[in-house]
């Protein structure tokens, strides 16, 4: 008897190709499932989720597979969006994609998969592992690898997950879609955070977190060099949006004092204070047993390079991460993912002092 695989379909080319490949294999009963988390409208006033669902319908009809839709909008706002706002208001820089994977896609969506009597869940993530029992590894396309975004998802939640695109390059996925005549073959990839869309980040955030004007201070001179509209708008290492003129070198956000509502900057992209030798990480998730110390590499942002480091477990359940070479713009609230080669060991949330000591 053939097993059933539920394909998480977003209306994009990646999940369309996943459904196509699984149907073509002939080994599974393939069922599409569209998940609505946010009701954002585009510049024409049309809900983008409605347009995406229309594309899911077209692909499902092309492939002759049944499809369903489920809305997690309420749960998304409670478990992802509200935390996102709370963290930003407190000066942190959270990663909502990591939260969404843990709280929605591989928790609530998995419950729906079981309701539909699915044996497997398949997604369009560019990573490897899951149902093959190996935990989680990078996808082979270095420009598309998404293991970073899944580093906070428990191993058990991935135990029935198929990642058909993990061994493919994006160009190959596009080619397959075009050769198969899939309706989404030329559809642009979605970028950015789903609930922000194409809007500038500041204009989005100010709808939910009130402006709070304060001083921008040069950390080295302790002189006021400008004004800001809210310390929560700025993240460590940020250059754009400071609106400070008359400086020989570009200015970068060094740290923030949320209590006093001060943003500290330094001048020059290689200013030594922008670099940290160590960090603490909390809310940890591991795919492998934690050894002491664990010699590995870490990514402190999605697009940052791998940094060699040693990881030491602490009694309170956090870990101390010591880098071989100081790392630039380590940001409290961001996700850190740990690797040995292509294998993702796990991940956590960065916890470093928000205020530099004088």
From Swiss-Prot:
Belongs to the MnmA/TRMU family. The gene is mnmA. SUPFAM superfamilies: Adenine nucleotide alpha hydrolases-like (SSF52402). Residues 95-97 are annotated as: Interaction with target base in tRNA. It comes from the Bacteria. ATP binds at residues 8-15, 35, 124. Pfam families: tRNA_Me_trans, tRNA_Me_trans_C, tRNA_Me_trans_M. It catalyses: S-sulfanyl-L-cysteinyl-[protein] + uridine(34) in tRNA + AH2 + ATP = 2-thiouridine(34) in tRNA + L-cysteinyl-[protein] + A + AMP + diphosphate + H(+). Its EC number is 2.8.1.13. It is found in: Cytoplasm. Its main location: cytoplasm. The record marks 125, 334 as: Interaction with tRNA. This is tRNA-specific 2-thiouridylase MnmA. GO terms for cellular component: cytoplasm. Residues 144-146, 301-302 are annotated as: Interaction with tRNA. It comes from Chlamydia trachomatis serovar D (strain ATCC VR-885 / DSM 19411 / UW-3/Cx). GO terms for molecular function: ATP binding; tRNA binding; tRNA-uridine 2-sulfurtransferase activity.
């Amino acid at each position: 008897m053939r097993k059933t695989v539920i394909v998480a379909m977003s209306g994009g080319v990646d999940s369309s190709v996943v459904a196509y490949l699984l149907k073509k294999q002939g080994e599974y009963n393939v069922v599409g499932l569209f998940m609505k988390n946010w009701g954002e409208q585009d510049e024409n006033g049309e809900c983008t989720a409605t347009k995406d669902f229309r594309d899911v319908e077209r692909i499902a009809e092309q492939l002759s597979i049944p499809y369903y839709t489920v809305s997690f909008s309420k749960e998304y706002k409670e478990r992802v969006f509200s935390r996102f706002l709370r963290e930003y208001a407190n000066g942190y820089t959270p990663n909502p994609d990591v939260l969404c994977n843990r709280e929605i896609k591989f928790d609530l969506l998995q419950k729906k998969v079981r309701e539909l009597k699915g044996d497997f869940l398949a997604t369009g993530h560019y990573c490897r592992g899951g149902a093959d029992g190996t935990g989680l590894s990078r996808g082979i396309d270095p420009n598309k690898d998404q293991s970073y975004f899944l580093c906070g998802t428990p191993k058990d939640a991935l135990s029935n997950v198929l990642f058909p695109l993990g061994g493919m390059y994006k160009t190959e996925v596009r080619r397959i879609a075009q050769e198969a005549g899939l309706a989404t073959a030329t559809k642009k990839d979605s970028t950015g955070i789903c609930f922000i869309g194409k809007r500038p980040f500041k204009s989005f955030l100010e709808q939910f977190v009130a402006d709070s004007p304060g001083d921008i201070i040069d950390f080295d001179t302790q002189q006021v060099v400008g004004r800001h509209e809210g310390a929560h708008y700025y993240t460590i290492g940020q250059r754009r949006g400071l609106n400070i003129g008359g400086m020989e070198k570009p200015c970068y956000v060094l740290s923030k004092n949320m209590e006093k509502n001060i943003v500290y900057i330094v001048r020059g992209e290689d200013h030594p204070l922008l670099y940290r030798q160590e960090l603490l990480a909390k809310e940890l998730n591991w795919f492998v047993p934690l050894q002491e110390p664990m010699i590995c590499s870490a990514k402190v942002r999605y697009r940052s390079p791998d940094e060699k480091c040693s990881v030491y477990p602490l009694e309170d359940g956090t870990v101390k991460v010591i880098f071989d070479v100081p790392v630039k713009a380590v940001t409290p609230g961001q996700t850190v993912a740990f690797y040995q080669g292509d294998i993702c060991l796990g991940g956590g949330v960065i916890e470093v002092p928000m205020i530099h000591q004088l």
